[in-house]
Amino acid sequence: MKAFNVNVSCFSTPLSQDIDTLLYADTPNPPNGITWQSWNACIYDCIVKAKELFAKVEDSNLPLVWLLPALAYQDELKQLLAKSFKQLFPEHVEHLLFYGAVGANTLVQLAVQKKWHKANVIAIDATYKADKNNEWVYLGVGGALATIETAQIGWMQTSHEFAPSIDFIKHDQLGGIFSKIVQDNKDHIDLIFAPGNGIHQQSDVWLTNLQLLSNLINEHTHYELPNYKLGKIGALEGLVNLYQLTSSPAIVNHFKHALVISQEQSKYQAAASYLWISEEVHN
């Protein structure tokens, strides 16, 4: 798999039941939040959502990749969810990616390594939206079912950098990640998906590192800030970003080099680079 497309066949979150409405319509007022009970309760809701989405898979012979909450440092929860999936879907648990928002970029990397022509993808995570007081409100668990498929013309992943980060301010990893991207890329970056949300200062540390990309960006570089529109949706965020990257005419008709920055507090920071390729380059 070089160039790829992402097709979302089912999208189910407390905020919207349609991915295009969520991306392109006026932002709806968020529903009333629900009381966060515990991660154990959230895991149970993730299992319920997984059963709902798995039942809608059309071709179960394709590889299936699960994009799941970033539970890197929560081994008990990770093992609980993995064990439940193995009991429910014993033939479809080879690829469980507990990376949250960065999982979708890891998915592309995996698809290239495995030389898949097409694969099923299910993303599940907790979702949050900012209220009128600019505080995150828990909405519940959301999920999406999609496919990733080889394309002759489209976006090709050229790099994927990932680093654990306990604290964005004290342990900022984006400086090193951006420096590596500059070393490995010579093409001008004309589109950046950035993770800031305007609520917590630590979420905008990517801005302080932007100068490291000065040789690759300029005043014409376009920025997408999905957290403002989508809220915090974890593993769903990465999938939605790739769907927008590969399907939006405003993007595919105008941009050639995209950078997708992902991060989750107390978890990780990451960035993936995508280059638009034509059929001639693909061949």
For each predicted feature, which ranges?
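Conserved "HGTGT" condensation-loop signature of ketosynthase/thiolase-family condensing enzymes
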Residues: 1-126, 134-283
